[in-house]
A protein has these predicted regions:
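Intrinsically disordered, low-complexity regulatory segments
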Residues: 1-169, 173-175, 354, 473
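Basic, low-complexity terminal or inter-domain segments flanking catalytic cores
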Residues: 2, 81, 88, 125, ...
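Amphipathic alpha-helical transducer elements in NTP-driven molecular machines
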Residues: 9-16, 33-36, 40, 59-62, ...
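C-terminal or mid-to-C-terminal helical accessory/interaction module adjacent to the motor/catalytic core
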Residues: 87, 93, 100-101, 140-227, ...
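A conserved hydrophobic secondary-structure block that centers on an alpha-helix together
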Residues: 110, 291-295
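Metal- or metallocofactor-binding catalytic centers and their adjacent structured scaffolds
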Residues: 243-279, 285
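Short, hydrophobic beta-strand segments
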Residues: 278-287, 372, 464-465
């Protein structure tokens, strides 16, 4: 008997159908010599500190460095603390019974780092010793599954992948647990989550936010001239930018006095734009955020759904290339899109022509190739699924299309000792840009086309204007720009060799970056304002504490990512990595514990009760910094969360302004002011009802 374990029930059922295991049982399918069971994501996790006899959030317990990590079933919240998920316990029992009855195991969890870890943790937790082989496929079509089953890989081939996943999991535990507890102990109250990748990501968001907010724009002036040649009007802008307005006005007058412009030079050239590479997950997430306003997490979820519906390849890929053998199938995929209404016309024109090979490179394919559609046309899809499918399908057509070719003309004009420049372009061959029919957006200075200007030609000056402009700050991060910053964090480093080594690793991985961003939302460190990511007071408070600490070091985080990639490649020892990460965990713990701090933002005031301390703000309360003072103000009042500003007003004036939206025990909303009485208890003051006018 052969056991087969998939990552989730839907995948297990698809594989079971193909291998003839159609008998339904509780937690598994059977038949034709197979027993097919499943996990549902991570069933096993690393045990928390209490499993090692360590008291949580105690200075003397830190750093927590377990000699050997224990594995436990996935936990869920209970009335007191956490307990094992009953559904997980039940399925683990089924998996153990299936494994016990079989001679060998086929591992059919997702073909990636997390899929490998899901199986290996179950395997080790159950103390299983059965031999196993690996089903390694890049799509869930029947054809891919059959080919994968005919070409099962030795389980040990993926030992390094497992060691890398295990090392990542343990590193995240060591850094996250120790840093979170150290900061929380130092703060004195509340729990403030930190993480190996989470914290550098927060620092990037906060740093950009503060840079944007504190930016002081500087004015400058440019000239815009209107002229014509051969009956065609066009505008040109001065190459100079004046920081002093009087200088710009003087230049304006000299141009007016000249009354004409002369063509100093004309450059004409053919510009070719290569088609974009195929999508990897991060590029798809960036594009979906920009074009569809989807979060990274939503895009990943939709891509996973399309993968499970057999219409898209494995989504968690970091490669933008396909190998030669997959490229051989692309003419059929292009022809298939001829049956898809959105792309039918373009695909028909591309069918039968030589496909562009820019995205084809065996050496640049990682565990999985770039995102492509499968041989199955989609049936019923949701609106969001169809939007993501069309991004991937359209990008495929773009990637395999010809270059976009333009004739570009750049002219330099002069008048009254001021030079002006103008650029125009004419499309010769749309190439890949014709897929979505989106024209390239040019800058302010680019015209659609220019007349045939000649060097030395004099042009009439129809008008000239003085333009007042100002410098602009870097924009706030969106999820798209943040993903790029995480992916290319190494490019902001000064050391060229380090840049090259970190380029492929970045901060986080394609599979984890969405979850990292969602964690920052869950921790209430950031919020969305339209498309922008904006830190909360809590997020900024944490940033101010950790911004110069090791845990926030982008370079260090990138180096750990590089080390994990080396473990996966078999060029670094996992035990050596573990020792290094333990030293790092001890360093950041000591660094955070040594800081004298409380989580408070700049808006605070003296304590009205003892007059010695200052009010410090925490997620659930505000309290006096004087340890002998008992003043505590809970943020939640009748289902209304008090802001720092309202608490300061209450402490300084003993009464707030009218606050709307309190909720009584009967569920009805009411408005009131809060009052701090002589005993420092908080009560309500209701607005006086206006007397009804007499009839």
């Amino acid at each position: 008997m052969i056991a087969l374990i998939a990552e989730k029930p839907s995948v297990a059922k698809d594989i079971a159908r193909i291998i003839g295991a159609t008998g339904r049982n509780d937690g598994y399918l059977s038949g034709n010599g197979y027993m097919v069971t499943w996990a549902f994501g991570h069933l096993i996790q690393l045990a928390m500190p209490e499993a090692y006899g360590v008291a949580n959030f105690r200075r003397e317990s830190l750093p927590i460095l377990p000699p050997d990590f224990q594995l436990i079933p996935r936990q869920v919240k209970a009335e007191k603390g956490y307990k094992a998920d009953p559904g997980v316990l039940k399925q683990l029992k089924v998996i153990k019974e299936v494994f016990d009855q079989c001679d060998r195991i086929i591992v059919a969890t997702d073909a990636g780092r997390e899929g490998e870890l899901i199986f290996r943790y179950i395997f080790h937790y159950l103390n299983c010793r059965k031999p196993f082989v690996r089903l390694w496929i890049s799509s869930l079509t029947d054809k891919a599954i059959r080919e994968g089953l005919d070409n099962l890989q030795p389980g040990e081939r993926y030992d390094n992948l497992y060691l890398s996943a295990k090392s990542r999991s343990e590193a995240d535990w060591l850094i996250g647990i120790n840093a979170t507890q150290a900061l929380s102990v130092a703060a004195g109250q509340g729990v403030f989550s930190l993480g190996r990748v989470q914290t550098p990501t927060l620092v990037m968001i906060c740093g950009r936010y503060l840079e944007n907010r504190n930016f002081v724009p500087a004015k400058f002036w440019q000239l815009k001239a209107v002229t014509a040649s051969g009956g065609i009007n066009f505008t040109a802008q001065s190459t100079a930018k004046w920081e002093q307005q009087p200088e710009a006005i003087a230049a304006l007058q000299r141009v007016k006095d000249a009354g004409q412009l002369v063509v100093k030079s004309v450059e004409r050239k053919e510009a070719c734009q290569e088609p974009p590479l195929l999508y990897d997950l991060t590029t798809l997430q960036k594009e979906a955020n920009t074009k569809l306003n989807f979060s990274a997490d939503k895009t990943l979820s939709i891509a996973q759904s399309l993968y499970e519906k057999k219409v898209m390849s494995y989504p968690r890929t970091g490669s933008r290339y396909i190998p030669e053998d997959v490229f051989d199938e692309m003419p059929e995929r292009v022809a298939l899109l001829g049956q898809y209404s959105r792309f039918a016309g373009y695909a028909a024109g591309l069918d039968g022509t030589p496909l562009n090979r820019r995205s084809v490179n065996d050496g640049k394919v990682t565990d999985h190739h770039a995102l492509i559609i499968t041989e199955n046309l989609p049936g019923e899809l949701s609106k969001d699924e169809r939007a993501v499918y069309e991004l991937v399908a359209g990008r495929m057509l773009e990637a395999f299309s010809g270059k976009c070719v333009k004739d570009v003309t750049t002219a330099l004009l002069s008048g009254g000792d001021t030079d002006f420049t103008v650029k125009g372009s004419v499309m010769k061959e749309a190439g890949w840009r014709a897929v979505f029919g989106e024209p390239e957006t040019g800058g302010d200075e680019e015209a659609a086309s220019l007349p045939p200007l000649q060097e030395g030609e004099y042009l009439p000056l129809s008008g000239v204007d003085l333009l007042e402009k100002q410098t602009k700050p870097k924009p706030l991060h969106t999820e798209s720009s943040l993903l790029a910053a995480m992916e290319n964090a190494g490019r902001e480093l000064e050391d060229a060799e380090l840049k090259a080594s970190l380029k492929d690793a970045g901060i986080g991985t394609p599979a984890t970056r969405a979850a990292i961003i969602e964690t920052l939302f869950a921790r209430q460190y950031i919020v969305r304002e339209k498309k922008n990511l904006v830190p909360t007071d809590k997020g900024l408070a944490v940033y101010r504490i950790v911004r110069d600490k090791k845990i926030a070091d982008v370079e260090m985080t990138g180096m750990w990512e590089t080390a994990l990639a080396k473990i996966e490649a078999g060029s670094m020892d996992a035990d050596m990595f573990r020792k290094g990460i333990e030293v790092y965990a001890a360093q950041i713990t000591a660094e955070l514990l040594s800081v004298q701090l409380s989580i408070a933002n700049g808006e605070t005031c003296s304590c009205p009760k003892c007059n010695n301390g200052r009010i410090l703000f925490y997620p659930k309360v505000a309290k006096c910094s004087n340890v002998d003072c008992t003043l505590t103000i809970f943020r939640n009042k009748c289902d209304k969360q008090l802001s720092d500003k309202q608490i300061v007003e209450l402490a300084t004036k003993r009464k707030t302004g009218l606050i709307k939206g309190f909720k009584g025990k009967n569920g009805k909303a009411f408005d009131a002011s809060l009052v701090l009485d002589e005993q420092f208890n908080i009560g309500f003051s209701f607005p006086e009802k206006k007397a009804k006018p007499k009839k």
